[in-house]
């Protein structure tokens, strides 16, 4: 297993590539194990987790940094993306019927439990970070759509 600094460095390198070149060719990488809250909720609620590890990918970083989000002020700061693997354990965790959502009150990080993607030309299913965005509605998670996971 990689150290947290190595994971943070890997995320920083991908973000740097995207800022400089508009893309990164880094393959999807593991940022750690699926945490206990998510695992127990999935087991109790028949949610399929494709793996016991959580992945991030350059493609998804590009998605959360796209120009349309930037124009609306919804892009999450690089430092928040870099620190997400460590900080997620202190964040609130929700489930919306399809994805898991981590939030720190200011931003939200969306995790798909069974995401299909190509890795080394082979289609696989992973528990994958799919996007992050700044929160604009502070009451967003108060509705019935979201289940808070303890």
What are these regions (language model features)?
Residues 1-150:
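Ribonuclease/tRNase effector modules and their secretory precursors
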């Amino acid at each position: 297993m990689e150290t947290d600094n190595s994971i943070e460095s890997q995320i920083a390198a991908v973000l740097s590539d995207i800022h400089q070149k508009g893309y990164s060719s880094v393959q999807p990488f593991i940022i750690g194990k699926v945490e206990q809250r998510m695992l127990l909720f999935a087991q109790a609620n028949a949610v399929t987790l494709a793996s016991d590890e959580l992945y991030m990918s350059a493609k998804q970083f590009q998605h959360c940094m796209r120009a349309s989000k930037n124009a609306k002020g919804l892009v999450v700061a690089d430092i928040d993306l870099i620190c997400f693997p460590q900080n997620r354990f202190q964040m609130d965790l929700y489930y919306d019927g399809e994805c898991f959502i981590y939030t720190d009150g200011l931003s939200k990080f969306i995790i798909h439990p069974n995401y299909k993607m190509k890795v080394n030309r082979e289609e696989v299913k992973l528990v994958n970070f799919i996007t992050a965005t700044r929160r604009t509605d502070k009451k967003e998670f108060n509705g019935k759509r979201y289940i808070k996971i303890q």
